[in-house]
Amino acid sequence: MKLFQIEEPDGSPADPNAPGAAVGIDVSGPVAEVAVAIGGNAAVLADRDGFEVDLRVPPAAAAMAEWQTLIERARLRAERSLARPVTHAVVVADGSAGERVQRAAAEAQLVLLRIVTPDQIAGPEPRVLTAAILAEDLAPRIAAPE
């Protein structure tokens, strides 16, 4: 049996150390939302039928494990929807939940680009979309090949 390797268009293999996608996560409501932005256009990510993930937001004083589970599930939703790794996020969280979110993201190995409170986001767009656009702006860029 012969195996073959799929290469990138320029012929070089993909960089396994390159940063993954950056998403916006809103945990300020009763159920978390996840979104991604490309070129400044954001879209809310949803689960496929039969693969739903429970994203109920725990109380601010809940155990750290509950917050970590929420962050991991939000990341899972994003990775399934995008079919690529997610490594960075901007999270919308009430002030009381900010510390929990920060610790949970660290445990889940998700790099927090910023935590914003709901009152820091103005405008008619849903907060998760604004967070996704901010995540795209703050995410590390992949260097162009030389």
Predicted regions and their residues:
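Detector for methionine-enriched segments
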Residues: 1, 6, 60-64
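Conserved phosphate-binding/catalytic loops in two-lobed NTP-binding clefts
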Residues: 106-128
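Gly/Thr-rich phosphate-binding beta-strand-loop-beta motif of the actin/hexokinase/Hsp70
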Residues: 2-46, 125-146
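Conserved phosphate-binding loops in N-terminal lobes of ATP-dependent enzymes
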Residues: 19-21, 28-114
